[in-house]
Amino acid sequence: MNFFDRLFKRKSKASIPPMPSWETIVEIMYDKHLDVFSDEVVKVIYSKDSSMRFVVLKNKKGFFTYQLESIYQYDEDEWKYIGSQDNTLPAMWEPFRGIVGKSVFESIDELLKELKAEPEYKSYFQ
């Protein structure tokens, strides 16, 4: 094979694994992406089916806050593009309904009391 043939030879398409079932995705995503937070992760509370989670965070000043996240499963086109790369997860955690506003609490007990009053907590976590 001469130089130009090697230079312009197309890479063979990598095989794309099939999209896992929803149950498998939920299992795979358990405790994933907790390292993306700049604050310390103190506690993670999962919904009954583990597809949602409250992440309790503590900042450097000692204040607590939380974020509600849900699993976003990539659609077919996204998976065709992303799935060919090594070590790719079929989903990601994202803020639930895009809500990122947070309250700040001085103690974790105060936070947990407020968290349990959230309508999402009552619907998906109890």
Where are these regions (language model features)?
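Short, mixed-charge low-complexity intrinsically disordered segments
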Residues: 27, 31-32, 112-126
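Amphipathic, interaction-prone secondary-structure segments
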Residues: 38-72
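A short, exposed loop/beta-hairpin motif centered on an aromatic-Gly-Thr core
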Residues: 40-41, 78-110
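Negatively charged, low-complexity tracts enriched in Asp/Glu with abundant Ser/Thr
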Residues: 2-52
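A structural signal for the main folded, soluble domain(s) of proteins
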Residues: 6, 71-72, 77-80, 102, ...
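Polar/charged alpha-helical tracts
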Residues: 5-9, 80, 110-113
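Intrinsically disordered, low-complexity regions enriched in Ser/Pro/Gly/Gln/His and often acidic
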Residues: 15-16, 72-73, 83-87
